[in-house]
From Swiss-Prot:
Homodimer. FAD binds at residues 31, 42, 82, 274. Binds 1 FAD per subunit. GO terms for molecular function: ferredoxin-NADP+ reductase activity; flavin adenine dinucleotide binding; NADP binding. This is Ferredoxin--NADP reductase. Belongs to the ferredoxin--NADP reductase type 2 family.
Length: 305
């Protein structure tokens, strides 16, 4: 049995595990994909809200966290998805999709909020030139790209594609973007065309490939937007939370409720990062990870909850 089980190898989970190691506690991190998977998915994304990394790319933060993991000798089991959890006396047991079981004195849940990408729910979304994540913006240079979405990632995606040489149009259902003003201003400077108050109606396809997006305007009428690539960036479905709920932790919607020490209502169970109601930022996730790790250490050593 491990001292601590940490589910999720993102900023919160890795920081929690590293903190535990600092205090002589042996954690095991269980990750459904790979270390820092979400951040690596947007490796090109500019970082403007993490001290010391302002203006750098997300990949540099991802690498820094991986270096921290190796420096402290944090053990991570990758490609291991937790599907069930239960308590046996004072220990917590996790069961995975592969049939393995892990036992720990405490559990820190740091699984983030990103599951599968949300879809538009219209035909031809499975065409090979319809994308949900852009890993290499330079591959789109010289092509016509339509981006659907209005949040941080949609705006940043449209911007970096335009800066990489693509002709970009962004479609948003509202009249204002949800991204920070600084990001919007950068998108404008990059020359991204905007189609606001408009909703995707149909993806036109020919020979199996998407060739245009038909959008309906709220004030009436439709527009056909020719394209070489379509990027859908409207958020993600939440991850599987049934195993979390089975532990009896209090939740609000898709988020786990915690106190200022990252404790849930269930003794021995903590949560940190985007899965909590805190702002969804790497900086906040790392800070919460430290608090969760330190509080878990104190609980393991003293038994005081």
């Amino acid at each position: 049995m491990r001292d601590a089980l940490v589910v999720g190898a993102g900023p919160a989970g890795l920081t929690a595990a590293a903190t535990l190691k600092q205090y002589g506690v042996e954690p095991l991190v269980i990750e459904a994909e790979r270390v820092m998977a979400t951040v690596y998915s947007y490796a090109w994304k500019p970082v403007e809200n993490y001290p010391g990394f302002d203006g750098k790319r997300a990949i540099e933060i991802a690498r820094a966290f991986e270096e921290m993991q190796k420096f402290f000798g944090v053990e991570v089991v990758e490609k291991e998805r937790v599907v069930k959890a239960w308590k046996e006396g004072d220990k917590i047991v996790l069961g995975t999709q592969s049939g393995n079981e892990y036992e720990g004195k405490v559990l820190i849940i740091a699984i983030g909020i990103l599951g599968k990408p949300r879809r538009l729910g219209i035909p031809n979304e499975d065409a090979p030139n319809v994308h949900y994540i852009v890993k290499d913006p330079t591959a789109f240079a010289g092509s016509k790209v339509v981006v659907v979405g209005g949040g941080d990632t949609a705006v940043d995606t449209a911007t970096v594609l335009a800066e990489s040489g693509a002709q970009v149009t962004i479609v948003h259902r509202r009249d204002q973007f949800r991204a920070p003003m600084r990001s919007i201003e950068r998108m404008v400077r990059a020359g991204v065309k905007m189609v606001l108050n408009s909703v995707p109606k149909e993806i036109i396809a020919k020979d199996g490939k998407a060739t245009a997006l038909v959008v309906t305007h709220k004030e009436g009428g439709e527009t056909v937007l020719p394209l070489d690539h379509l990027v859908i960036s409207i958020g993600f479905e939440p991850p599987d939370l049934e195993w979390v709920k089975s532990l009896g932790v209090n939740m609000r919607g898709k988020e786990i409720l915690v106190d200022d020490k990252m404790r849930t209502n269930v003794k021995g169970v903590f949560a940190a990062g985007d899965i909590t109601p805190a702002p969804k930022r790497i900086l906040v996730a790392a800070a919460q990870g430290y608090i969760a790790g330190f509080t878990a250490f104190r609980y393991i050593r003293t038994g005081v909850w």
